[in-house]
Amino acid sequence: MKKQSVAFALCASLVCSPVYAKTFVGVLWPMFGPAAAPGLVELVAELKMMPDVEVRTYLHQSWPYLVQDIDHQTPGTRTVVVGYSLGANSSVFVANKAKYVDLIVALQPSMFSWNPSVTGNVGRMIEIYNPNRWMTFGGMGSNKLVGPNIEYIANNDSHPGAQFNPIFRNLVKTEVAKLSTEDEPP
C-alpha cells in the first residue's frame, strides 16, 4: 500500500506540474571565435541567466553541429540561432538544413562569404546590417541575406562595434524571452 501511495504521489506531482516551454539558443561565433567578439560573449552570459533558456556556442564553421543539436531538441522546445559576421552567414546553412528554427538573428553578415538563399523552415529571421560597406571594413558587415521572412534592420555600426549595439542586444533578449513564454510551437 505504501508503494502505491508513493507511486500515486509521483504521478500526481508530474500531472500537476506546470508545463513551460524551454528555449534553445545556438550562437555562431565570427571568425576567430569568442576572442573576436567580447560583446557577444557578454550577451551569451546574459542569455544563460534567463530562466528556461539553454545556450550553446559554436564556431561559425561548426554549424552542422548546431543543426544536429537543434534537430535533437525535445518537441515543444523553441529554437533560436544568433550569428555574428561569418556566424551570421552560417545561420543560412543552419536554416536550410535544420528541421525548423523559430528565430534567426543575423548580425552583420559578411560579403566575404558565399551564401545561398534561405530556403529552410524558419519562423522568423531578422538581419541587422550596415548598408555602407566602407564602415564595415570593405563589406564585413554589409551583406544582405536573401530569403522569405527576413526583416532587415539597417544600422551604421562599424563591424567590430555592432556586437555592442544595445538595439541588437535588447532585440535578442526580448525575442528569446517572448519565445520562452509562448505556450506551444506554431
What are these regions (language model features)?
Residues 1-6:
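Bacterial N-terminal signal peptides that target proteins for export
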Residues 48-57, 98-103, 145-150:
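Structural alpha-beta junctions
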